[in-house]
Design a protein with these regions (language model features):
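Glycine-centered signal
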Residues: 4, 24, 29-32
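N-terminal secretory signal peptides that target proteins for export/translocation
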Residues: 1-11
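Beta-strand-enriched cores of mature, soluble protein domains
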Residues: 30-178
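Bacterial N-terminal signal peptides
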Residues: 12-25
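Compositionally biased, low-structure terminal segments
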Residues: 5, 15-17, 169
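Compositionally biased, intrinsically disordered low-complexity regions used as flexible
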Residues: 1, 17-18, 121
Length: 178
Protein backbone atom coordinates (compact mmCIF):
# COMPACT_ATOMS: atom_id res chain seq x y z
CA UNK A 1 0.00 0.00 0.00
CA UNK A 2 1.14 3.47 -0.81
CA UNK A 3 0.58 6.40 1.51
CA UNK A 4 0.15 8.89 -1.26
CA UNK A 5 -0.08 12.51 -0.13
CA UNK A 6 0.34 11.86 3.62
CA UNK A 7 4.09 12.46 3.66
CA UNK A 8 3.79 15.70 1.74
CA UNK A 9 1.48 17.13 4.50
CA UNK A 10 3.70 16.20 7.44
CA UNK A 11 6.26 18.97 6.94
CA UNK A 12 3.74 21.82 6.36
CA UNK A 13 1.64 20.62 9.32
CA UNK A 14 4.76 20.63 11.51
CA UNK A 15 5.62 24.22 10.50
CA UNK A 16 2.03 25.38 10.95
CA UNK A 17 1.96 23.89 14.46
CA UNK A 18 5.31 25.43 15.35
CA UNK A 19 4.33 28.90 14.08
CA UNK A 20 0.94 28.73 15.87
CA UNK A 21 2.63 27.76 19.13
CA UNK A 22 5.16 30.59 18.88
CA UNK A 23 2.53 33.20 17.96
CA UNK A 24 0.12 32.14 20.70
CA UNK A 25 2.95 32.04 23.21
CA UNK A 26 4.11 35.58 22.39
CA UNK A 27 0.74 37.33 22.18
CA UNK A 28 -0.38 38.53 25.57
CA UNK A 29 -3.76 37.24 26.63
CA UNK A 30 -6.58 39.81 26.55
CA UNK A 31 -6.71 39.83 30.34
CA UNK A 32 -3.15 41.17 30.48
CA UNK A 33 -3.67 43.98 27.97
CA UNK A 34 -4.35 47.52 29.10
CA UNK A 35 -7.54 49.44 28.43
CA UNK A 36 -7.06 53.16 28.31
CA UNK A 37 -8.86 56.23 27.13
CA UNK A 38 -10.51 59.47 28.07
CA UNK A 39 -13.68 59.89 30.06
CA UNK A 40 -16.38 62.43 30.69
CA UNK A 41 -18.54 61.82 33.76
CA UNK A 42 -21.54 63.73 35.10
CA UNK A 43 -21.95 63.22 38.84
CA UNK A 44 -24.83 64.19 41.15
CA UNK A 45 -25.06 63.49 44.90
CA UNK A 46 -26.67 64.50 48.16
CA UNK A 47 -25.55 64.21 51.75
CA UNK A 48 -24.61 66.02 54.92
CA UNK A 49 -21.95 68.43 56.08
CA UNK A 50 -21.18 68.70 59.79
CA UNK A 51 -19.39 71.91 60.78
CA UNK A 52 -16.80 72.22 63.50
CA UNK A 53 -15.19 75.54 64.38
CA UNK A 54 -11.59 75.02 65.44
CA UNK A 55 -10.57 78.58 66.07
CA UNK A 56 -11.45 82.17 65.43
CA UNK A 57 -10.76 81.99 61.70
CA UNK A 58 -11.06 78.26 60.95
CA UNK A 59 -14.05 76.01 60.26
CA UNK A 60 -13.95 72.43 59.02
CA UNK A 61 -16.89 70.63 57.40
CA UNK A 62 -17.03 66.83 57.41
CA UNK A 63 -18.73 65.85 54.14
CA UNK A 64 -20.58 62.56 53.63
CA UNK A 65 -22.64 61.97 50.49
CA UNK A 66 -24.12 59.35 48.17
CA UNK A 67 -24.68 59.84 44.47
CA UNK A 68 -24.64 58.50 40.95
CA UNK A 69 -22.87 59.12 37.68
CA UNK A 70 -23.33 58.66 33.97
CA UNK A 71 -20.46 58.75 31.50
CA UNK A 72 -19.42 58.44 27.89
CA UNK A 73 -18.62 54.73 28.28
CA UNK A 74 -16.27 53.54 30.97
CA UNK A 75 -17.58 53.88 34.56
CA UNK A 76 -21.13 54.43 33.29
CA UNK A 77 -24.14 54.03 35.62
CA UNK A 78 -22.14 53.95 38.86
CA UNK A 79 -23.34 54.66 42.40
CA UNK A 80 -20.91 56.43 44.72
CA UNK A 81 -20.17 57.10 48.37
CA UNK A 82 -17.93 60.10 48.98
CA UNK A 83 -16.31 61.48 52.12
CA UNK A 84 -14.21 64.56 52.54
CA UNK A 85 -13.30 67.68 54.43
CA UNK A 86 -13.88 71.29 53.50
CA UNK A 87 -11.60 73.68 55.33
CA UNK A 88 -12.31 77.40 55.63
CA UNK A 89 -9.36 79.39 56.97
CA UNK A 90 -9.08 83.19 56.93
CA UNK A 91 -11.61 83.53 54.11
CA UNK A 92 -10.12 80.80 51.90
CA UNK A 93 -11.80 77.44 51.30
CA UNK A 94 -10.46 74.13 49.99
CA UNK A 95 -12.01 70.66 49.93
CA UNK A 96 -10.49 67.21 49.55
CA UNK A 97 -11.59 63.62 49.94
CA UNK A 98 -12.28 60.36 48.16
CA UNK A 99 -15.15 58.55 46.45
CA UNK A 100 -15.76 54.82 46.13
CA UNK A 101 -18.10 53.72 43.35
CA UNK A 102 -19.79 50.51 42.27
CA UNK A 103 -21.19 49.54 38.87
CA UNK A 104 -24.27 47.41 38.18
CA UNK A 105 -22.39 44.10 38.53
CA UNK A 106 -20.33 45.01 41.60
CA UNK A 107 -16.99 46.22 40.14
CA UNK A 108 -15.61 49.10 42.22
CA UNK A 109 -13.44 52.14 41.48
CA UNK A 110 -11.93 54.67 43.89
CA UNK A 111 -10.61 58.17 43.30
CA UNK A 112 -9.19 60.98 45.42
CA UNK A 113 -10.08 64.61 44.73
CA UNK A 114 -8.98 68.08 45.76
CA UNK A 115 -10.44 71.47 44.92
CA UNK A 116 -8.57 74.62 44.12
CA UNK A 117 -8.40 77.22 46.86
CA UNK A 118 -11.45 79.45 46.52
CA UNK A 119 -13.72 81.98 48.18
CA UNK A 120 -16.22 80.31 50.55
CA UNK A 121 -19.22 81.64 48.59
CA UNK A 122 -17.81 80.83 45.12
CA UNK A 123 -20.56 79.23 42.96
CA UNK A 124 -18.34 77.18 40.62
CA UNK A 125 -15.14 75.51 41.86
CA UNK A 126 -12.53 73.59 39.88
CA UNK A 127 -10.34 70.75 41.08
CA UNK A 128 -8.34 67.65 40.24
CA UNK A 129 -8.86 63.94 40.79
CA UNK A 130 -6.70 60.81 40.67
CA UNK A 131 -7.84 57.20 40.28
CA UNK A 132 -6.39 55.22 43.18
CA UNK A 133 -7.73 51.67 42.84
CA UNK A 134 -10.57 49.33 42.15
CA UNK A 135 -11.84 45.77 41.96
CA UNK A 136 -12.98 43.49 39.16
CA UNK A 137 -12.60 45.13 35.77
CA UNK A 138 -11.37 48.31 37.49
CA UNK A 139 -8.57 46.57 39.43
CA UNK A 140 -5.37 48.51 38.88
CA UNK A 141 -7.12 51.59 37.45
CA UNK A 142 -4.85 54.61 37.13
CA UNK A 143 -5.24 58.05 35.66
CA UNK A 144 -6.31 61.55 36.56
CA UNK A 145 -8.16 64.59 35.40
CA UNK A 146 -10.03 67.72 36.33
CA UNK A 147 -13.52 68.51 37.50
CA UNK A 148 -15.86 71.46 37.63
CA UNK A 149 -18.12 71.57 40.69
CA UNK A 150 -21.39 73.44 40.14
CA UNK A 151 -22.73 72.64 43.63
CA UNK A 152 -22.74 76.30 44.67
CA UNK A 153 -25.47 76.96 42.10
CA UNK A 154 -27.93 74.73 44.00
CA UNK A 155 -29.62 75.29 47.34
CA UNK A 156 -30.33 72.23 49.53
CA UNK A 157 -33.83 71.79 50.96
CA UNK A 158 -32.74 71.47 54.59
CA UNK A 159 -30.07 72.95 56.84
CA UNK A 160 -26.97 70.75 57.08
CA UNK A 161 -27.70 69.04 53.77
CA UNK A 162 -25.48 69.36 50.72
CA UNK A 163 -26.09 68.69 47.05
CA UNK A 164 -23.41 68.14 44.45
CA UNK A 165 -23.34 68.42 40.68
CA UNK A 166 -19.96 67.93 39.01
CA UNK A 167 -18.52 67.22 35.58
CA UNK A 168 -15.29 65.20 35.41
CA UNK A 169 -12.92 65.05 32.41
CA UNK A 170 -9.85 62.87 32.46
CA UNK A 171 -8.03 59.74 31.46
CA UNK A 172 -7.82 56.19 32.74
CA UNK A 173 -5.70 53.12 32.20
CA UNK A 174 -6.58 49.72 33.59
CA UNK A 175 -5.71 46.09 32.88
CA UNK A 176 -8.46 44.51 30.75
CA UNK A 177 -10.33 41.62 32.28
CA UNK A 178 -12.51 40.69 29.35
Amino acid sequence: MKAVGIAKWRIPAFWFGLVATVVLGIVRPASAQMLEGTLSITFAAFGTADAMTTGKERTVLAIDENGLSVSNGVLNHMTWHCSGLAEFTNGVAQTQGFCAGRDRVGNQAIFNWESEKHAPDQKVVRGTFTWSGGTGKYAGIRGDGTYVDYSGEFRPLTEGAIVSYLVFEGSYKTPATQ
